Amino acid sequence: MPVQEQTGLIMRKIIKLLLIGAALCLLQPLAAQDFLQDSIPETVITATGTLHLLKDAPVQTEVISRQMLQNYSGRSLEDILSGLAPSFAFNEDDMGSHMQLNGLGNNYILILIDGKRIHGDVGGENDLSLIDPRNIEKIEIVKGASSALYGSDAIAGVINIITRKHKEEGLLLENSSRYGSYNDIRQHNAIGLKFGRFSSLTNFQFQHSDGWQNTSVERTVGTEKPITDSQNKTVNRHSNGQIGEQLTFTVNDRLELYAGGTIYAKRIYRPSGKYAQYDVHTYDLQYHNASASAGGTWKPNDTDVVTFDLDWTRHAYMYYFTATTLVEDYEKSKGTIYYPYFPYLPDQIEMQSDQRRTMASLKGVFTLPAGNLLNTGAEYRYDWLSAPNRVVGGKATDWTAAVYAQDEFKYEFGRNSLLHLAGGLRLTWNGSFGMKLTPKFSAMLGLGLPWRIRATWSQGFKTPTPKELEYRYVKQMSGTYLYLGNTALRPQTSNYFSLGGEYTHAGLSINVTGYYNSVKDMITLVTIPNYQAPAEYIIQYDPVKTRQYQNVDDARTIGVDVSVRYSLREWAFGLGYSWLDTDANQYDSSHDRMRNVIIDGTAHHKGNFFTTWNHRFGPAYKISAGIYGRMSSTRFYQDDGNGKGYQIWRISTTHDLGNFERTVWRIEAGVDNILNYVDRTPHGLHLGTTTPGRTFYIGLTVNFNSGRKVRNTFNSTISNNYNSSTNDEN
């Protein structure tokens, strides 16, 4: 029997057993107390910048809770999002995660940590290993343009990572160690202190993997012989570590101040083979990041909140040479004279890019008469880029200032019925592109307790980055390839529409949302004739091909997201499905015309499934077990083949041990990709997934907390304090 048929048969049996188990549960007598209810109703803050119960938020918000994170036991943020949210797709490589949300890529997704932007990229890809999965309290996902609140980048949506806080008087000590296949190591440590008005939380994380090779076959070009012994890995060996510190001082009941910072380093080890154009690598990739922040929260009265923040971040990307490397060099002052090489020796480091960003913000939430809530603020951002080998002149800068205001209105009518409106405007002033006004409007109509209808219209606005404007990079790959920026680029804009319905009753939650996103003047790299490039570059580099950033694409995405969740006694079930269709008007360089194509990476169908069981065997032992599945149809690309469809299933268990007043012992163990699916597509072609096949993991967490819970009065807006929206579980 073919492998695909065997896989399908096994999956049908698993689903049948799960349905039988669910039916047996339903046959038992039902009572109101049988349904699992949160002791604290879920609250969200990302969509509007103000705190709301999830069921009453005017904008559809997807939440991955702390309990879901613990049950799933994901090894990374990519693992968590792909396993628990079907709208996401990833395709990891050395340049990043290549994340997509509802068809649009990383450049259009804004990632926040406690409301602050994650900064730094390589090739437009954020380094998600900056985020320690063990330090996540919950994840809030808002889809569609959010530029009225967050500015550029938020055309596809916003992911807000809300981290854990030390809220208890006394001492907190936590260690979490996890080991898995391919020498996968995940280490997390935390030390928390809270005495009186002062608190400190220190976090350390370390991650390592030996990487893996799913195939040794390399795609070759032209008439070259196939390569069957390539040394390239599907995922390279890598290590990274980060240490962070957060200090908080409560001046009085009205004012709280904070300061914090992080230091991060990462290295990607690239094996070297014998085929010069394919698997010979003479340098590794290295990253050095740092951040510092300070600010505070002020409550002028019992209802209003003002926050002020100053943030600085640095992201440095460099080559670490592992073998003598002869780099082709040119000396412009001597005209067309060609100098064949410039040597780099082992252990030398060459800076590729050094990005630094400074942001200042002032935000306030004010209660107004007649059920209105005003959220307003001002921001300033300064970007500095140093890339001697990659931008014209070696450096580039950019600045953006913005003011925004949003008003929310609530009106209760009838029995348990609610109308919630939110409208906002953002005025952005960019140093290179002038002013732009972007609006957003959302409405939620609650019809009794179970029914909610939501609608949103919003515009997005994204200015070209300094890299897209000033890029100049030469790459040796079967000849010289020249990549150029374009100072004539226009900002990208979008219009986003969504309409959704929600039904929630007696442990059952069903949510269906349809959306349409139209993006104008998309920026992408296109091949141009050499004569269109600056003559001095053609003389200097003599490229075989020249590519330049241009506004050539208009894109549209349309789709439907469906989520079903049901909780009964100790059981929970979930099903997610995402249907997506995309098209773009793309420049065809070979025929010098526009053509209609699908957006790269699009999968028309994606889904996930989970069922979990939680049971306490007396005061000293509790078990949580879950089966999770994620599926994707074919991912389509214009070049280098399509990514294969797949389905991957996972078993995860957690075991809470002991009955100690101050110490928590938790063991995690599980099997990922239990059906052992591997995509062995040759290197150089697109993959559906990079999974190495069946893998195993085990982990131990020890948490010691000597203190008592204290009440936090600073329920602020989006800035730095989310304690009111988190649960009390460590």
Regions found by a protein language model. Give the residues of each.
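Gram-negative outer-membrane beta-barrel transporters
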Residues: 370, 375, 411-416, 515-518, ...
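Surface-exposed extracellular loop regions of Gram-negative outer-membrane beta-barrel proteins
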Residues: 431-436, 449-497, 516-550, 630-635, ...
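Periplasmic-side early beta-strands and strand-to-turn transitions of outer-membrane beta-barrels
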Residues: 178, 194-285
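Outer membrane beta-barrel strand-and-loop segments of large Gram-negative receptors
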Residues: 357-363, 396, 402-404, 490, ...
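Short acidic/polar hinge/loop motifs at secondary-structure boundaries
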Residues: 116-143, 245
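N-terminal periplasmic accessory domains that precede
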Residues: 77-80, 97-100, 112, 126-132, ...
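Extracytoplasmic beta-strand/coil segments of soluble accessory domains associated
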Residues: 78-116
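C-terminal beta-signal and adjacent terminal beta-strands/loops
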Residues: 212-215, 520-521, 525-527, 655-730
